[in-house]
Amino acid sequence: MKAERIEQILLIHLLATAILAVLAFGTVESWSLVIFEINALVMAVMMGLLQLVDDDFQWRRLRFSLPLWALLLWGLIQLAPFGIAAPAGGPVDAPPESLSLAQLRLPTISKDPQSTREVVARLLALAIYFTVALQVFRCSAARRLAVRVLAVFGLAISFLAIAQRLTWNGRLYWVRQVSAFVSPFGPYGNYNHFAGMVELLFPLPFAWLIFSRGRGGERILYAIAVVIMVTAAVLSMSRAGMLTIGVQLAFFAGAAFLHRRRQGGGPRLTPLLIVVGAVLLSLWIGYQPLLRRFGTIQQ
């Protein structure tokens, strides 16, 4: 019972982190990164507690996270000191023994140890989150909950992004002033980042629409979520985002066709209706800007 409770807390914690990381302007600033990394350490402690109370806990279930941990290990190796210490300050010709520790620099594989340390810290946090996800999403009920939560969140944040674009006053969330040198969209300071978020979110409800036979109300909600998310990504004017989403939609259309042909299931017109809906809504909201943007894709 304790193990189930801890897993439920981890699941809610993980989904809340995914949502808040987006809302915090994409978690690219120092304050949000610190919270993101400390939060990962808290989840690591909870995973340790889960291992202690769960008799069925098996680390081999988490083996898919090994590439991330291997990459983290490579980052640590790049920070490992080797060779003879060199002066980092003071007279260049001074003998090392006459310098303090603050004036010595130990050679490392990394040419920029400070940047490497920052990346290693972020990679550690991401590895922890991914490992937790592998543990909590073993259950099909948890996966269904994640699809519902992320689909509704994707719908809400995309609707907010469209509304913010139509009523843009030079401020994120209509409150925070942004520099004239950035190109924000939604909660992000870079429209390409918003498009990247949509590329990750909209396949979840879209795949559910194609491969699952759910209730009518849920299907309508997911279809609306996909249309709004794709529309928001198109209106972000991210050329790479448009091309990537186009490839994703083509892939899902092919998957839907094969699914229908092999198993005789799945709604035949779902991908086509979603594409048509997203295109029409995008043209209705931003016809002229889209034409200008498509004219620059060849560049």
PLM region descriptions:
Residues 1-27, 34-48, 68-72, 76-82, ...:
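Alpha-helical transmembrane segments of multi-pass inner-membrane proteins
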Residues 51-65:
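Membrane-helix interface linkers and caps
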Residues 54-56, 93, 112, 169:
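Acidic-enriched, low-complexity/disordered segments with a strong bias for Aspartate over Glutamate
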Residues 63-65, 71, 75, 87-88, ...:
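Membrane-interface helix-loop-helix modules in multi-pass membrane proteins
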Residues 84-111:
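Extracytosolic (periplasmic/ER-lumenal) interhelical loops and adjacent juxtamembrane/interface segments
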Residues 299:
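Extracytoplasmic catalytic/substrate-binding loops of multi-pass membrane glycan-assembly enzymes
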